[in-house]
Swiss-Prot record:
Record keywords: Cell inner membrane, Cell membrane, Chaperone, Membrane, Protein transport, Transmembrane, Transmembrane helix, Transport
Subcellular location: Cell inner membrane
Classification via InterPro entries: Membr_insert_YidC, Membr_insert_YidC_N, YidC/ALB3/OXA1/COX18, YidC/Oxa/ALB_C, YidC_ALB_C, YidC_periplasmic_sf
Membrane topology according to the record: Multi-pass membrane protein
Protein's job: Required for the insertion and/or proper folding and/or complex formation of integral membrane proteins into the membrane. Involved in integration of membrane proteins that insert both dependently and independently of the Sec translocase complex, as well as at least some lipoproteins. Aids folding of multispanning membrane proteins.
GO molecular function list: membrane insertase activity
Domain of life (superkingdom): Bacteria
An annotated GO cellular component: plasma membrane
Phylogenetic lineage: Bacteria, Pseudomonadati, Pseudomonadota, Betaproteobacteria, Burkholderiales
Organism: Burkholderia mallei (strain ATCC 23344)
Protein name as it appears in the record: Membrane protein insertase YidC
Presence of keyword S-adenosyl-L-methionine: no
């Protein structure tokens, strides 16, 4: 029993330390395990940010424009010429900056269940405190890029009730004999935006430009539950290496590891619940870059070469821009691997089937809270044989605890004899001190996976359960579930054998309080899962202990 408690305490201590370290990092404090990265004020050059390869646009003609915030160089036309064109669809409200035809603001109006106004979230924004935008331009010469002021082509800016698509077009000034017409196509009910770049050669010589498509974001954190940490930063997906996450810290240290050339896949910016991604046409060769362009500003993008365009001719480059919630089924239908932006970490292989099952249950009951309850019940049923073995072992250990204490008292001055006597007792009573521990350890990956499923699923956002729980992604407003969690843990402690060590006994009594403090700040959906799991565990343990006790009494009577 002491061995089991030791293992459980190690698990508890490591979990507490990891949760605290995640809380430190999510609140901008240095990690306890990784050195703090000192940011420099040196703007990135035109390399791709992959220190290993060093392959990128070495020629000045192919260098990406250095202006990071969209502000024009001093030699260009005054900034007052740029305008913000407001638009609206059934899922978006946004603004396109005519400087570069940049998608500078994008508010998702139907995130979550779309019923509450406070569920709207602004994904792209361009203010003094926060920058996150999507932009495109041309490389390969003095061609139009995101620093040039475009002219809006006259047309509607709102999706009418009888329309399925809305198109917004912008024309660039002629530069280097080239004019660009950029068209955004919004489709009803879709978080995928079509972006078409038409390149017209109005000069007298052939041109060979490249189109760049990038996402620019600062490293400011998004709101996440306290004591939890979710990934924030760029990601690259290709057939070669599949899903590659890149931390801002790795970019700072020039240690970003990702595929730099491909003809498939996508690039993205990922945050809790939401993501954006450029998805170029499959089969089109492109270079991928991830780099730092300001002390706190980063970009991830692709550069796609265009075949030579003769004078008087034009070429079209089409791509898709996803900007929306990380809903797995929707993401799977947009592009291969895009569902991976919903980050489950190292437990993905278990978490994905669990979410699939949770989703199926939700489809049956129509409520995410009850789906969590039923999934927890189902998991407990599947693991009942393991739990039964654990509780039986605990019950047997509880029976021989007085004899163990007597042996400890008898041989307290001779640890070697005490251990030998304990081993003999285990052998005689056919008790395995690891018997109660191993079944619990086997179940831990599943419980951790379900934790990440509930933490990462945007479906919980704005999803009610019953009575006072109106949003499973937010903490319990009246702390009823955390209190129930503490009570259930206290009851479990009482059902377990009392540790022989008084200090250890006090620590076991302190555990419900320590965990409750953390659970006061956890999302209600997570706490609901743990409360239901604890209640079912108590019922299982009580039933098994009572059954064994009855069997032992009958055996003794006979």
């Amino acid at each position: 029993m002491d061995i089991k408690r030791t293992v459980l305490w190690v698990i508890f201590f490591m979990s507490a330390v990891m949760l605290f370290d995640n809380w430190q990092r999510s609140h901008g404090r240095p990690s306890m395990f990784f050195p703090n990265v000192t940011q420099t004020n040196t703007a990135s050059n035109a390399t791709n940010g992959n220190g290993a390869s060093g392959a990128s646009a070495a020629a000045a003609a192919n260098a990406l424009p250095a202006a990071a915030t969209g502000a024009a160089p001093a030699t260009t036309a005054p900034a007052a010429q740029a305008q913000l064109v407001r638009f609206s669809t059934d899922v978006y409200n946004g603004e396109i900056d005519t400087r570069g035809g940049t998608l500078a603001k994008l508010t998702l109006t139907k995130a979550g269940d779309g019923k509450q106004p406070d569920l709207s979230v602004t994904l792209f924004d361009h203010t003094a405190n926060h920058t996150y935008l999507a932009r495109t331009g041309l490389l390969g010469g003095d061609f139009p890029n995101h620093n040039d002021v475009y002219a809006q082509v006259a047309g509607p800016t709102s999706l009418a009730a009888d329309q399925n698509t809305l198109k917004l077009s912008f024309e660039s000034p002629v530069k280097g004999g080239v004019k660009v017409v950029k068209t955004y196509t919004f489709t009803r009910g879709s978080y995928v935006i079509g972006v078409d770049t038409k390149i017209e050669n109005v000069g007298a010589a052939p041109v060979t430009p490249s189109v760049y498509m990038e996402l620019v974001r600062d490293n400011s954190s998004v709101e996440t539950p306290m004591f939890s940490h979710t990934f924030l930063g760029p990601a690259v997906y290709t057939d070669q290496k599949h899903f590659q996450k890149i931390t801002f810290g790795d970019i700072d240290k020039n240690k970003a590891d990702y595929v730099t050339s491909a003809d498939n896949g996508w690039i993205a910016m990922v945050q809790h619940y939401f993501a954006s991604a450029w998805i170029p046409q499959s089969g089109a060769k492109r270079d991928i870059y991830v780099e730092k362009i300001d002390p706190t500003l980063y970009r991830v993008g692709v550069k796609q070469p265009v075949e030579a365009i003769a004078p008087g001719q034009s070429a079209d480059v089409s791509a898709r821009l996803f900007a929306g919630p990380e809903e797995e089924r929707m993401l799977e239908g947009i592009a291969p691997g895009l569902e991976l932006v919903k980050d489950y970490g190292w437990v993905t292989i278990i978490a994905k089937p669990l979410f699939w099952l949770l989703e199926k249950i939700h489809g049956f009951v129509g409520n995410w809270g009850w789906a969590i309850v039923l999934l927890t019940l189902l998991i407990k049923a599947v693991f009942f044989p393991l739990s039964a073995a654990s509780y039986k072992s605990m019950a047997r250990m509880k029976e021989i605890t007085p004899r163990m204490q007597a042996l400890r008292e008898r041989f307290k001055s001779d640890p070697q004899k005490m251990n030998a006597a304990l081993m003999e007792l285990y052998k005689t009573e056919k008790v395995n001190p690891f018997g109660g521990c191993l079944p619990v350890v086997i179940q831990i990956p599943v419980f951790i996976s379900l934790y990440w499923v509930l933490l990462a699923s945007v479906e919980m956002r704005g999803a009610p359960w019953v009575l006072w729980i109106h949003d499973l992604s937010q903490r319990d407003p009246y702390f009823i579930l955390p209190v129930l969690m503490a009570v259930s843990m206290f009851v479990q402690t009482k059902l377990n054998p009392t540790p022989p060590d008084p200090v250890q006994a006090k620590m076991m009594m302190f555990m419900p309080i320590a965990f409750s403090v953390m659970f006061f700040f956890f999302p209600a959906g997570l706490v609901l899962y743990y409360v239901v799991n604890n209640v079912l565990s108590i019922a299982q343990q009580y039933y098994i202990t009572r059954t064994l006790g009855g069997a032992a009494a009958k055996k003794k009577a006979s």
